[in-house]
Amino acid sequence: NEVLRRVGDDNNRPLLNVPDPRAEIERLLAVRREAYAAIPWQVDTTGLSVEEVAARVIEIAGVVTLPVRYPGGAPSGLAESTAGRPQGGQYEIYIGDRVLAHVGSLLRAAGAPEGSRVAVVSNPVVAPLYGAQVEAALRSAGFRPFACSIPDGEQHKTLTTVATLYEQFLAGGLDRSGTVLSLGGGVTGDVAGFAAATFMRGIRFVQVPTTLLAMVDASVGGKTGVDLPQGKNLVGAFKQPALVIIDPTVLATLPAEEIHSGLAEMIKHGVIAAPDLFAELEKGIRYSPFTTHHAPFAVRSSQIARALRVKIEIVEEDPFEQGLRAVLNLGHTVGHALEKLSDFALRHGEAVGIGMVAAARIAAELGRANPSLADRIEALLAAWGLPVGCPPFDADAIWEAMAYDKKRRGRSLLWVLPRAVGQVEIAEDVPPRVVRSVLCSMGARCEG
């Protein structure tokens, strides 16, 4: 109808100079459907003025696209059958304001078949905000989406939650041609990704992170998983997404404390390999926009992209965390222990920030970094509203919690120690007395 309306009385249309123009249009659309679907960026101009169409095209032109390459196979030392060996490939990360509206066309361009089911996995906080918009965008691209809900919070990152997702997938008619789309933060992405990796031995997975922490960290790299009572992420799988869609405008509904938590991961990436990003965040303190409960559009696409490039370069070189990728765990050895001891009342970014300060002070105690480095990291974290002291947990309890950390080599804990902004090293020769001394100096409860 729309095509016929636009053509009107224009007779200079040879293909429509037939007895039944409507039937000819339907035939042409059917022939061209797959070609059209392969175009990632599409603008429905129905009812829009020229100015409105131009504005949408300009918006698309501002989207940052980051390719991520990954190899086939599995981590070294793990058995795998030739038939079941994952193939290597590439996916794209799209970063831009209001890119959420294009999730359907981007998924079609990534190879998802028209008419297939899409399980939109979210939580009761995020789903009312963005669920309908995502499902509408999927329907407009010819998909059949359905909503799946999981509880919000790290305490629900369990095998039990994954099992409830399997039930929802089956009830929604999801099959091997379908897609699991995570709409939420890091917990949602970890659980949904693990479910996608294991349901029917693995189906397509898409990440749509809605927290800054997930945007710059959890949504990229293919790590998915759940916790056990003994520790975080002890059960999981590597599952590369088909694509990642990052829309910074959704941060408008995120509390400032959650923005700060994500900034801790951005600061971490700066310490690891992006001194320019670290310096930019230091300069940003002078005009901090985080003065209200919500912080709309405070973080730019370019900053998110810069933080992501650090992780992308590392995970492309070490996709299965066999060596170099371990540097991304800066702050996580102490951080994960503090999260566990707080029953996850401590946000992940907050815990990682404290862990970074601890790692920098350990490096200084060992003579591997100037003490001023720890002061600089601590000052930046504190300026963005993040805690820098250790909660008053017993130092021995913190050490015991670290005993179940995945970052081990034999009986030795692996530590990521900063030597300078933009330079870190992996160490396993850190004496327990040094760790204890640093934790005590930062506020841990110590006796004797």
Regions found by a protein language model. Name each.
Residues 280, 284-287, 293-396:
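Active-site segments that bind and position negatively charged phosphate/pyrophosphate groups
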Residues 1-33:
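A glycine- and Lys/Arg-enriched "phosphate-lid" helix/loop adjacent to the NTP-binding pocket
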Residues 71-89, 286-301, 447:
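Intrinsic disorder/low-complexity segments
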Residues 40, 194-284:
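A glycine/threonine-rich phosphate-anchoring loop and its flanking beta-alpha core
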Residues 30-70, 433:
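NTP-dependent small-molecule kinase module
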Residues 187-194, 215-216, 337:
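Short glycine/serine/threonine-rich phosphate/pyrophosphate-binding segments
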Residues 62-81, 87-179:
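ATP/NTP phosphate-donor binding region
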Residues 258, 264-267, 368-448:
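C-terminal charged capping/lid subdomain of soluble metabolic enzymes
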